[in-house]
Amino acid sequence: MIPRYTLPEMGAIWSEATRFRLFVEVEVAVVRARARRGLVPADDLAAIEDAPVPAPERVHLLDAELHHDVIAFLTAYGEGVGEAARHVHYGMTSSDLLDTTLALQLTRACDLLARRLDRLVGALRDRALEHRDTLCLGRTHGVAAEPTTFGLKLAGHAFAFDRDRRRLAAARDAVAVGTISGAVGTYANLPAEIEAEVLKELGLAPEPAPTQVVARDRHAELLAALAVAGADVERLATEVRHLQRTEVREAEEPFAEGQKGSSAMPHKRNPIVAERLVGMARLLRGYAVAGLEDVALWHERDISHSAVERVALPDACCVLDYALERAHWLVAGLRVSPERMRANLEASGGLAGSSAALLALVDAGWARENAYLAVQRAAMAAWEGKGGFRDLLLAEPGVAEALAVPDLDAALDPARFVAGAGPVFERLEALR
């Protein structure tokens, strides 16, 4: 991923220096396992353990000649090992090294993303509890529906990201798998006991039925989980973008002192971070499709997946890492305007209470269809600016006789619509 969207900790996981260091860890772990069986002399093991990680520049130089990055790495590493290098990569194939190293990188990336999700869930929980009683207009199809609270809006996002945590944990388990099984996964030159020992040392499980590679449905599952998390970020960002519209102005993302919103229009305060997060989600969906394309390889393996996942896996992890960090910034610093929320609710002229008026008439003995038609006539007249919904409804034939004005006012009270939402916040308070 380009530096603009790469944060330091995630970038370090996917750096070439880290990859080569993990290459060495995997190779040394195999040599140690063979040494414990008396197959590698102690002096040779020491030489291998003490050898430096090859410099990327040397590996690149060799790769330009050899056109094989793993052989280039092993050659560069062997230069630092000396004669004991004959024990390095013994009985292994390139994918043993590549896939096991990739699993180490992916599990570390997942752990970092899990911490990001924890922070975001916590921020959403706190802001939702802060605004549990902040009344606002609920909208369906972008149109006024019924009263809700801003806390309820945020609670829904908190639970969504909690589900993302569970999906990520499952996907981490799926990719925490390596293989040290040889050219076509038959353990022809290294016994499965060595694989089990090495992978346990590295914190990985073995692929139960390896070919030459770890099955790629594992990586597809991870990319899908990252894409769903990205979609949840997009949903949150889209809500902020709509609420920041000039004619709505119920919430807006932070705008720093000295920040500029437009080269041409000095008045602009645009939701640029929220818009950027929507773009991040689009990238993640593309990477998920790429992961699915990589599942079907020829026979025991081809390398059609290689170029794809060298881009898709690091980029997807970096993109979601960035998106989650920015989403936390957005939530923690979100400027909320309860006054605008109340004003927009009142501007609906009571229309948001139409369902309560309908049920009040039904409770008064009206047939539901007759009640619906009376409420709808009053609502349509209110939409057309012919008066307030409450007064228009009371003018409908028979309504004033069926409903006392205090009872209708109580039914239309916005607070009544959210009075039963307590269990949502009880569940939210338990979210950690």
Where are these regions (language model features)?
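Alpha-helical support elements that line or immediately flank enzyme active sites
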Residues: 31-32, 105-117, 226-235, 240, ...
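A conserved active-site cap/scaffold subdomain adjacent to cofactor or substrate pockets
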Residues: 218-250, 258-317
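A short, charged helix-loop
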Residues: 197-213
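C-terminal alpha-helical interaction appendages
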Residues: 333-402, 418, 423-430
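Long, amphipathic alpha-helical stalk/connector segments used for oligomerization, subunit docking
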Residues: 283-366, 374
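A helix-coil-helix interface module used to build multimeric assemblies
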Residues: 1-187, 192-197, 206, 259-262, ...
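Residue-level signal for inorganic ion chemistry
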Residues: 38, 320, 371
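Amphipathic alpha-helices that form helix-helix packing interfaces
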Residues: 33, 113, 117-120, 124-127, ...
